[in-house]
Amino acid sequence: VPNDFGVVSLCITDDRFIHHPYRRGVYMRDSEGDRNPELFFVLREAVEAIDAFLQEGRQVVVHCHGGRSRTTFVLKAWYMLREGKTHAEAHQWVGDEWPLYETWTRTFLDVLDNEWSDYVEAVHREWP
């Protein structure tokens, strides 16, 4: 990854990216149930990291171990918030853009369908 890119890591990376100057680690597990306490807030932190890098004029790399579930969970949330889209629309967008996309983590889907959708709606009501 070029040094001027922002990197949002969603998994344990060991020493990878340790010296990368623009990096945010937001750890989440690709697991069902309560293995991700406060998942909504972790998701919001990841989306805010993407936006912060973009506001700095950086290209952004969002990644997890396999690039299938956590990465697309965060990218769907970002798209929903930035574009005012529904989870179904974000699902279509990611599916069209990313061939590795998979949806096996029901907990992620539930957060996007409920808490995140409510958050997106509330934010867009407040925006002029």
Predicted regions and their residues:
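Glycine-rich nucleophile elbow surrounding the catalytic serine of serine-hydrolase chemistry
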Residues: R68-F73
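Cysteine-based protein phosphatase catalytic domain of the PTP/DSP
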Residues: V1-V60, A77-L112, W116-V120, W127
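Short cysteine clusters
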Residues: C64
